[in-house]
């Protein structure tokens, strides 16, 4: 029986790693009934609840874990993080009652683990987003961003870029994100810079940045991103069509953006080019599998009006 139970548990962990939580949860629930004090299982169940945005359930698991092991930084981080995410989902008046506990748990996590990156990132976001009257502080956000920089230069640059972007200093944000690319060069660093350019109405720079990332990382999702920018800003249509065609040719569910969105972007580009019939072909394809695709319905009306 022990071997069978162990095999079942390992299977649940595999499901968890695959994010197949509907299969993992019943096995963990069953195991917890037999081993009610097992911290690892309770953490798994808390994580599954958090993934499903069942904040009260997640908070309940993490709070109990913190009480059982007060010196575990990760438990404090998850407890504080779950409360923070719940606070974002409720009214402001109710959310303010969580501020003290969120701050305590995240700062406790950072103090217990001097290299806990996620806790420091959460504190950067906490202090920069919270109004000053309730304890928000750009200086404290900067302090935690600088702590991140000592642990990971890339995270430090990204955090400082995030603060600059949030406080409407796009030139400073651009400088920090470029440094993050220079030091790290991960897809995420390119994505942050490209997103900044999009927000500040710099589509040429956004396409150039995403194109550079595509050449380096060969991620198919970047083909879609280039096509999206091309469609939205009526920019480099041939390149946009090429990238969207490549996206569809290499598509897998892991790419994250459904095919009908690529069809929609192709329709937009052809509409921008004044090619009504081709645009209609693509927009009808977008609506074929998803008839309630509101953006595509609106786009079709614009195409028909050409």
Protein language model regions, located:
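Canonical tetratricopeptide repeat
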Residues: 40, 44-45, 78-81, 122, ...
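Short coil/linker segments at helix-helix boundaries
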Residues: 15, 53-67, 71-115, 121-147, ...
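TPR alpha-solenoid repeat register
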Residues: 41, 75, 119, 156-158, ...
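Residue at a conserved register position within TPR or TPR-like alpha-solenoid repeats
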Residues: 15, 49, 83, 90, ...
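Alpha-helical adaptor scaffolds
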Residues: 13, 125, 191, 195-199, ...
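Short coil turns that delineate tetratricopeptide repeat
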Residues: 36, 70, 114, 151-153, ...
């Amino acid at each position: 029986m022990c071997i069978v139970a162990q095999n079942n548990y390992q299977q649940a962990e595999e499901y968890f790693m695959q994010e197949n939580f509907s299969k993992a949860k019943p096995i963990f629930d069953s195991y917890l009934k037999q081993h009610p004090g097992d911290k690892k299982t309770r953490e798994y169940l808390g994580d599954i609840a958090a993934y499903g945005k069942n904040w009260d359930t997640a908070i309940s698991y993490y709070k109990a874990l913190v009480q059982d092991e007060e010196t575990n930084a990760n438990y404090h981080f998850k407890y504080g993080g779950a409360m923070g995410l719940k606070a974002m989902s409720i009214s402001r008046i109710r959310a303010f009652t969580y501020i003290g506990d969120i701050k305590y748990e995240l700062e406790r996590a950072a103090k217990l683990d001097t290299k806990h990156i996620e806790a420091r990132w959460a504190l950067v976001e906490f202090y920069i987003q919270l109004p000053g009257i309730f304890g928000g502080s750009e200086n404290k956000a900067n302090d935690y961003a600088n702590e991140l920089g000592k642990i990971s230069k890339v995270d430090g640059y990204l955090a400082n870029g995030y603060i600059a972007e949030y406080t409407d200093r796009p030139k400073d944000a651009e400088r920090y994100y470029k440094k993050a690319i220079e030091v790290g060069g991960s897809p995420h660093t390119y994505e942050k810079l490209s997103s900044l350019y999009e927000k500040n109405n710099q589509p040429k720079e956004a396409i150039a940045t995403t194109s550079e990332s595509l050449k380096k990382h060969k991620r198919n999702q970047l083909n879609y991103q280039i096509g999206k920018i091309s469609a939205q800003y009526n920019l480099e249509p041939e390149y946009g069509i090429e990238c969207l065609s490549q996206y569809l040719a290499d598509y897998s569910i892991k790419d994250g953006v459904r095919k009908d969105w690529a069809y929609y972007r192709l329709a937009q580009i052809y509409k921008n080019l004044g090619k009504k019939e081709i645009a209609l072909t693509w927009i009808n394809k977008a609506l074929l599998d998803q008839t309630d695709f509101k953006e595509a319905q609106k786009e079709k009306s614009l195409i028909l009006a050409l």
